[in-house]
Structures are given as structure tokens and as C-alpha cells.
């Protein structure tokens, strides 16, 4: 068996959709969307998957605290195969206060060429896709690195091992699918605030 990479996350926020139940290989799971709030006040939408018995009697409008890991899977959306990022909760606790937590810790391997760019506002960004081993499976998780981290990591080759801390964020964007036809889509990625290249043994 391939050794698992580090993949730990904590979330706390408001349940903004009614949990929906489904069965998978004999187990009952529930899925819902969780809203977590940044310091700026912007809300991030997190897709949560959890075994039903661990969630208990939670409904839309409740606040929950979760511990688990970031997962990915492919889904057919609008006749295209797209990567969906989710939070798989191992523990779930209903809470009374309006706490907001969104903390992600990952290690994995660069699995696509890194895309480095600079925004009109002068921000430097590196888009990085990492593969995080999970037994015989692998989760593909997109990262966004900013400014100094973006510069430092832009020339990493595929296969380089990195570790990061950050938050799972969501954003809307416009995509042209045909001449003159633009659709609004949503992406989820981990915004990195602290990073280290394990190959080089640099300190975060």
C-alpha cells in the first residue's frame, strides 16, 4: 500500500443547505454546503460529505464543527468531466456559537506544470495542482500561492513534494464556452498562507 500523505483539516461554520442522504457501498452518507467566513467578511462555500450517524440531527441554519480531510472526485457537469473538491468529515459536532474556522494542512506531489501569472493589481500567483496519496487512491487538489511563495515555487518540477497550510476557498468566474456565450462557474482551491518544499527542506 502506498503511504498516505498528510491531509488534515478543521472547519466550523453555518450549514446553508439541508443535508441530503445517499447510500454508497452499504453506508449512508449525508452531504451539505457549509459557509465559512474570512476576516474580510467574504464567505466560502464548502461541500461537506459525512457518514449520517456522525452528523446526527443537523439541519440548515445550524452551526457545526468538523474535522477531516480534503477529497476530490470527478463528476460529469454540463457534459464535461470536472474536478469537484469536497471536505470529508471524520468528526462532526453541533455547536451553539457562530464560530468560523477553515484550516487546511496538506502534503503532496506537484502533478501538473505550475502556472505563474501576475494580476493587473500586481499580485503574483502560482497555480499548483498536487496529488495527495490516500491508500490506493489519490486526491488531486488545486492550490493558489501568492507573491513570495508564488515566486519561490514557480519553477518546481513535477514530482516535487511540498507541504502547505491554508484555507479552502471558493470563487466565481466567467468562462466562454462558445463565441459570445459566457457562463458563470465556481471553483474551489486551497489558498496557501504557508508553504515548504520538502525536497529542499526549506522552513515554512
Feature locations, PLM:
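Single-stranded nucleic acid-binding surfaces, predominantly the OB-fold ssDNA-binding core
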Residues: 1-204
Amino acid at each position: 500500500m502506498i503511504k498516505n500523505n498528510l491531509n488534515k483539516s478543521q472547519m466550523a461554520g453555518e450549514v446553508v443547505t439541508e443535508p441530503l442522504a445517499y447510500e454508497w457501498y452499504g453506508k449512508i452518507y449525508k452531504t451539505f454546503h457549509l459557509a465559512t467566513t474570512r476576516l474580510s467578511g467574504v464567505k466560502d462555500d464548502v461541500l461537506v460529505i459525512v457518514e449520517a450517524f456522525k452528523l446526527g440531527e443537523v439541519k440548515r441554519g445550524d452551526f457545526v464543527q468538523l474535522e477531516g480531510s480534503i477529497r476530490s472526485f470527478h463528476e460529469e457537469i454540463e457534459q464535461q468531466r470536472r474536478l469537484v473538491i469536497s471536505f470529508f468529515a471524520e468528526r462532526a459536532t453541533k455547536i451553539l456559537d457562530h464560530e468560523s474556522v477553515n484550516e487546511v494542512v496538506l502534503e503532496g506531489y506537484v502533478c501538473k506544470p505550475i502556472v505563474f501569472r501576475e494580476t493587473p493589481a500586481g499580485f503574483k500567483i502560482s497555480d499548483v495542482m498536487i496529488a495527495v496519496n490516500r491508500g490506493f487512491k489519490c486526491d488531486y487538489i488545486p492550490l493558489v500561492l501568492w507573491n513570495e511563495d508564488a515566486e519561490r515555487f514557480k519553477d518546481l518540477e513535477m514530482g516535487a513534494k511540498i507541504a502547505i497550510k491554508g484555507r479552502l476557498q471558493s470563487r466565481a468566474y466567467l468562462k466562454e464556452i462558445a463565441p459570445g456565450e459566457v457562463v458563470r462557474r465556481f471553483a474551489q482551491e486551497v489558498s496557501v498562507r504557508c508553504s515548504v518544499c520538502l525536497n529542499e527542506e526549506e522552513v515554512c
